[in-house]
Regions:
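Active-site phosphate/pyrophosphate-binding segments
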Residues: 253, 259-289, 379-501, 573-590
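Glycine-rich phosphate-binding loops that contact phosphosugars or nucleotide phosphates
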Residues: 283-424, 458, 505-547, 565
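Conserved short alpha-helical segments that host acidic/polar catalytic motifs at enzyme active sites
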Residues: 1-246, 250, 255-259, 265-266, ...
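Acidic/histidine-rich
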Residues: 153-187, 448-474, 509, 516
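Short helix-capping/linker segments at secondary-structure and domain boundaries
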Residues: 12-13, 134-140, 167-169, 409-418, ...
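Generic C-terminus detector
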Residues: 549-590
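Glycine-rich oxoanion-binding loops at beta->alpha junctions
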Residues: 70-83, 265-279, 303-339, 479-495
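Short, solvent-exposed amphipathic alpha-helical segments in soluble enzyme
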Residues: 20-24, 85, 114, 175-178, ...
Length: 590
């Protein structure tokens, strides 16, 4: 899992690549590297650590040239070392490669290639430059050698290659891993996503599975893996680049938390006709299945409740990574709703491919227009919440909920009413941000030494217990467990002891009496209770106030307090909430 970028133009590559990698840092990484091409030589700089530190250690003057590639890496094959950082080169340092994905047949290839060429790393990626070199040594020109090598690779990959044997050119290939071109005047880019090149061009071309591209600074040509040319129209990227900056905030996470009232209002700008058409299709489907991972799965669980309570339609939620094991009943009468912020999540993409192979209709809820998932879907709804840079989902989660509410209200013929209610909710969230932040920061301080947290809720808020626990795990590195409160006595109660923090989501809806009873059981065992409710209760040691709303809307007024609790808990522990260890924003491998 990583971010990749390739540049060819008329300006020195290193600063452009460095800045591009900085914009890709949000994807998560443990090492970084750059290779440039100049005067018949590949210049290489790579190491474990942050982009700025890696480049500083190498000295920019040692990376000349107007063609280059850059990489930020999360280790999947090989430990975190300089040797395993990208780019990887052939033995003569004439070919440099960066790669996102997993080469599934790398052991077979390595066993063959190691008889001819010396390997320097433990990664699967290093087979690629040696494989290209093997084809060159067999007598092929470099371009033909590149295509011959790509055809031998199995697995998922987005690769970019430069070589002294093809000066001034970039070569790239994609299979099951995102790739997009940035087309400018006397400059071209290829990378993982548009943020990497957005300051330089807004014209983009999305590369599909099974395609390669050959680029110079003023031309590009797309091919299939058999080297047959293909045509593709470009699209204009409308994202505001300023949204990808922190502004006056110390972290992206708190900036994106505070953007959520505006995000809800933006979500209400959806096309009513499309929402109504999609609602009709949902109602006509024999079965409706949500497919998602992580925070998106918790949004789907809430969507299931809202579809039932408001839309009077049963649906199911299956983890994307498990979908293939439960897809026996999927057929042409199935509607799959795939949810992914990036639109590139590998497990979701794999599930969608399986669903489409069985004839299912696929709708997607995504943030990134032009993403792989949106292009694969029969219809797509866009979150339109702007770039989300913090690794932990915040505003994208809330935007996902809003679109699910809109679909449910459209299913019940009350779309306009649903929009009016959500507009009211956005104002209530804004008030909560103004009134609760200081109190929540104080609560985080009180619990900064705790290592185990339990989040309890019932009904529609059950998924919020899971989401709250996930946020705390992601940014604070503590054990946190979200569960239906009724399950507490079926095992987890054995873990409650004196001082154990229990976060209870218990608005005064139809679940109130039951969850108060469950909390009381925890209190008797010594739990310290943080209550999130519209009313205080004697069982609470700490109270985070939320407004009173209709039962189905409590997740929307609960989400911000949970996010703030996680954010401030990270801050008081001295952690960077934007870059949780071991996690990536866009999980593009299975």
């Amino acid at each position: 899992m990583c971010g990749i970028i390739g540049y060819v133009g008329d300006k020195p590559a290193v600063e452009i690549l460095k800045n591009a990698l900085t914009r890709l840092e949000y994807r998560g990484y443990d090492s970084a590297g750059i290779a440039t091409l100049d005067n018949g030589k590949v210049h290489l700089c790579k190491n474990k650590g942050k982009v700025a530190d890696v480049i500083a250690d190498c000295n920019i003057k040692n990376l000349p040239g107007c063609t280059g590639i850059g990489h930020v890496r999360w280790a999947t094959h090989g430990t975190v070392t300089r040797e395993n950082a990208h780019p990887h080169c052939d033995a003569s340092t004439e070919i440099a490669v960066i790669h996102n994905g997993i080469i599934e047949n790398y052991e077979e290839l390595k066993n063959r290639l190691a008889k001819k060429y010396k390997f320097q790393s433990d990664t699967d990626t290093e087979v690629i430059p040696h494989l290209i070199r093997e084809q060159v040594d067999s007598g092929l020109n470099f371009e033909d050698a590149f295509f011959a090598a790509v055809r031998q690779l199995q697995g998922s990959f987005a690769i970019i290659v430069i070589s002294t044997l093809a000066d001034g050119k970039l070569f790239a290939a994609r299979k099951d891993s995102p790739m997009v071109l940035g087309i400018g005047k006397d400059v071209n880019f290829v990378g993982s996503d548009v943020l990497s090149f957005l300051p330089y061009t807004r014209e983009a071309v999305y590369i599909e599975d099974g395609e390669c591209v050959v680029m110079t600074k003023n031309s590009f040509q797309i091919y299939d893996f058999d080297h047959h040319p293909k045509q593709r129209a470009s699209v204009n990227i409308t994202w505001d680049l300023s949204e990808a900056g922190k502004g006056d905030y110390p972290h992206f996470m708190i900036k994106e938390i505070k953007e959520q009232p505006a995000v809800i209002r933006q979500a209400l700008m959806q096309d009513d006709r499309q929402l109504n058409r999609m609602a009709i299709d949902i109602l006509r489907s024999r079965q409706v299945i949500f497919v998602a991972c992580g925070s998106s799965r918790f949004a789907a669980l809430i969507g299931r409740y809202v579809f039932s309570k408001v839309g009077h339609t049963f649906s199911d939620v299956i983890m994307a990574s498990e979908f293939g094991y439960f897809s026996d009943s999927v057929d042409k009468n199935t509607l799959v709703i795939a949810i992914s912020q990036s639109g590139e999540t590998a497990d979701v993409m794999n599930g969608v491919k399986q669903a489409k192979a069985k004839g299912a209709t696929v709708y997607s809820i995504v943030n990134v227009e032009g993403s792989s998932l949106s292009r694969m879907s029969d219809k797509a709804l866009y979150l339109s919440c702007g770039p989300e840079i913090g690794v932990a989902a915040t505003k994208s989660f809330t935007a996902q909920l809003c679109l699910l509410y809109l679909l449910a209200y459209a299913m019940d013929g009350r779309l306009i009413e649903g929009k009016e209610k959500l507009l009211e909710i956005s104002s209530l969230i804004e008030e909560g941000l103004q009134n609760n932040t200081t109190e929540i920061a104080a609560i985080a301080e009180k619990f900064k030494d705790k290592k185990d947290f339990y989040f309890l809720a019932r009904g529609i808020n059950f998924a919020m217990a899971g989401e709250g626990a996930l946020k705390l795990k992601e940014v604070c590195y503590v054990h946190a467990e979200g569960m239906a409160a009724g399950e507490l006595k079926h095992g987890t109660l054995a873990l409650i002891e004196d001082g154990t923090p229990v976060v209870a989501i218990c608005p005064t809806d139809y679940t109130y009496a039951d969850i108060v009873s469950n909390i009381s059981e925890a209190v008797v065992r010594g739990a310290t209770v943080i209550g999130i409710s519209n009313t205080n209760h004697s069982v609470f040691n700490e109270w985070i106030k939320i407004p009173e709303v209709e039962m189905v809307f409590y997740p929307l007024v609960t989400v911000v307090p949970l996010q703030l609790l996680a954010y401030h808990s990270a801050i008081v522990r001295g952690l960077d909430p934007d870059k949780p260890r071991n996690l990536a924003k866009s999980v593009t491998v299975k």
